[in-house]
């Protein structure tokens, strides 16, 4: 099929020859994604996807994969695909420096966002399992205070997430100045939901963020050929490596 496309599109054939002779990195990526050659026929296909388009595609991927490892592999493959798209456009001088940097930053932001969504989804499922295995309520009459406590407990069970987590982009990622080898400098902040126990919220935030980091860097099966895994660096946080990986909003406010 691609030979027909190259025969019918001299521009695509010329672009392919240019890429293969100028970039070993792109050549390695193309070997595992030959359908990407079709992008060479249209300049529009060599433009970085918008943040909205990436979000929609990633949301669809997550909904189709119940297993977090499988879902994250799909997201990481998408990231590699989009890096290839940007690299091809860059090699052919079809993109400005700003387009390249912003495109790469957007892909990494969405990848981190996907890992956060998966980690939170796991936490919700764990909470639902705990609720299912919890002892059933007694049918004995309860006082007003017990009723109120029961309602509060039921509300907490309906929403297993005790805190809201945000990832703050720093460095090159924060300034949308990414290169092809850039890592992602970030800080993690959380805000307990109203009525949540602060210690429990902090413990949950720690679990979610540690799982996020694991999903991004752990080996996937089958391995993604020529993947350069995203390196997430949270060392710019208060107290560096010795400090808490994720802090509450109030903690950041007090620190600064």
Segments predicted by a language model, with ranges:
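Non-catalytic regulatory/linker segments of enzymes
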Residues: 1-256
């Amino acid at each position: 099929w691609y030979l027909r496309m190259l025969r019918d599109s001299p521009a695509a054939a010329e672009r392919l020859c240019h890429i293969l002779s100028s970039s070993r990195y792109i050549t390695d990526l193309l070997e595992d994604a030959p359908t990407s050659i079709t992008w060479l026929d249209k300049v529009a296909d060599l433009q970085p996807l918008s943040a909205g388009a990436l979000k929609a595609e990633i949301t669809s991927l997550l909904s189709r994969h119940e297993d977090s490892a499988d879902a994250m592999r799909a997201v990481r493959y998408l990231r590699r695909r989009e890096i290839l798209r940007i690299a091809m456009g860059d090699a052919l001088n079809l993109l400005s420096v700003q387009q390249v940097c912003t495109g790469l930053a957007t892909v990494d932001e969405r990848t981190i966002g996907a890992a956060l969504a998966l980690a939170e989804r796991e936490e919700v499922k764990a909470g639902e399992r705990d609720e299912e295995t919890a002892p059933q309520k007694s049918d004995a009459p309860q006082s007003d205070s017990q009723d109120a406590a029961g309602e509060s407990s039921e509300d907490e069970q309906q929403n297993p997430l005790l805190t809201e987590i945000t990832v703050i982009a720093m460095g090159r990622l924060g300034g949308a100045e990414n290169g092809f080898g850039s890592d992602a400098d970030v800080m993690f902040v959380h805000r307990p939901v109203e009525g949540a126990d602060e210690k429990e919220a902090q413990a949950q935030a720690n679990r979610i963020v540690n799982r996020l980091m694991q999903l991004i860097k752990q080996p996937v099966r089958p391995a993604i050929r020529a993947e350069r895994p995203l390196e997430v660096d949270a060392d710019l946080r208060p107290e560096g490596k010795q400090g808490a990986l994720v802090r509450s909003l109030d903690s950041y406010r007090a620190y600064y």
